Amino acid sequence: MNKEGITVAGNLIADVVYTIDVYPQKGNLTWMRNPVAHTGGINNLIIDLARLDSKIPIKVSGVVGDDENGQFIVDSLREYPNINIEGIVKKGRTAVTFAMTEKESKQRTFFFDPGTSLEFNEKQIDFKKIKADIFHLEYLLLLGTLDQPDEDYGTKAAKVLATAQKYEMETSVDMVSEEGNRYQKVVWPALKYTDYCVVNEVEGTGVTGIQLYDKDGIKEENM
């Protein structure tokens, strides 16, 4: 890697984790206890990279709200001198994930409020400011505006990745595991302009249409 580092773009999210007694049936009540705030979304990757090597420049591109959660995210990133937050736009309400963890089973259930993160778009990305060796975008299928169709590139995200390549950056993407058939509409166009793609087995099945496992386990013939 050269000295220009890595740019990470996408969903900047605040996570609030609660412990609950049990997950309630519809219409019923349960107690929520011990809320703990964490950074989520691309924040975790950014901080991990900054910790991994303090000499690697890390640049951020995304949207947070002009609110307490947005300031929490910005402050958490400011703790690392090799993280450049000039590419963060403040607007509206910060995206928040509320995670409910059952006390006994430790099973987690997630409630996501996207806030204005869905409005993150190519016009808010200053490629001259965030020029790097690698441009990483996540999460496809959770990007709102960038997941929308584009006449020339297939999706807005694909256009962003193509632009990053024009600035001589290698491109990388990650996505969320989603039920449904949006993978081919949203992910396929982006892959044309992607050098590195990170997927799990659920996402791999969604993208390729090849079933990797069923109720009986892994389908060895498709591996």
Feature-to-residue mapping (PLM):
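Ribokinase/PfkB-type carbohydrate-kinase core domain
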Residues: 1-14, 71-89, 96, 101-223
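Alpha-helix N-cap/helix-start capping motif
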Residues: 43, 67, 92, 201-202
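Glycine-rich phosphate/adenosyl-contacting loop at the front of the ribokinase-like
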Residues: 1-63, 68-78
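Short beta->alpha junction loops/turns
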Residues: 63-66, 91, 176
